[in-house]
Amino acid sequence: KNRGYSRYSPQIFIQNLNQEEIAQLQQEKYKYPGVDIRIRTLRDYTYPIASHILGSVGEVNYHDIEKDDYYVVGDYSGRDGIERTYEKELRGKKGVEIFMRDSRGRVQGPYRQGELDLPAQAGTDLHLSIDIATQQIAEQLMHNKVGSIVAIEPQTGEIITMVSAPNWNPGKLVGKERSANYQQLLDDPQKPLMNRATQAQYSPGSTFKVLQALVALQAKCVTSHTQYPCNGKSSSPIKCTHDHGSPVDMEEGIEQSCNPYFWALYRDMLQQDGYQDNHIAFKQHYNQWREIIASFGLGKRFEDTDVRDQAAGYLPTIQFYDKIYGQRGWKAITI
């Protein structure tokens, strides 16, 4: 559906011609009265990186046109990433030219010599917190790998690097090959269009140990001087992958990333006060632990951010474990 269609108004017949095609058409254009070539701007990406951050632009569809009267057939808009988040800021404002037409709708010239015309306004420049050098290094590190890297400025919370691998060259989704290239990305079994930095769910790994220590101190079930034994690879039920002395206090547990220390710490948090066989008290302690962990933002989407398409993490509830293991069938080691 082409709103504003008129047989006397310019209509797009074909677009995104290359130089060779333009030259060929110029030679034959005299045979086709009414055919003209017009130049328009097209998105250009300086670096072949940061595809999941930048996103892409694509031609608007019927729903876009119905939703926003800014668009007409042939316009482009941001489809994902920063391109979509800041579409209204980046697109600027269209210019206006008023023409006089005859009874058949044919243009007769500008109205009042164009004094009511309005010039187009360029979109706003957008400055990201991404550090291009760091982004390039991170993408090189993730070449031929699957996963993500995110680097954040601690003082401000700004994202300086965000990589999801595999990714693609954002320039591939510009121009006449966009549809074919996009379909190729859709069909790729490694799902390069998925932003693993914001949409995948991963276990936090050893970075979680520092948070675990803070929660234990807040719960006052241990002190920083509380020690637990570590027998290295012979430890049970959790083995240690580092070579260090025993017993281990909190400082050394963090420094050595000692698995047995943090297993014992977590066990005592949930079974404190001698409630090892009291599942009511055990679950109360689990709920307290879960609430504190959630207060750090785990299991939640980021708020007040321009990072799109986030998937929330998951902090299992008591009901989750009860359903899988039964009401008395799970312990600290299960978690």
Predicted stretch roles:
Residues 1-177, 201, 285-295:
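Periplasmic/cell-envelope proteins involved in peptidoglycan metabolism and beta-lactam response
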Residues 102-115, 147, 155-207, 211-335:
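Beta-lactam-recognizing serine transpeptidase/beta-lactamase-like catalytic domain environment
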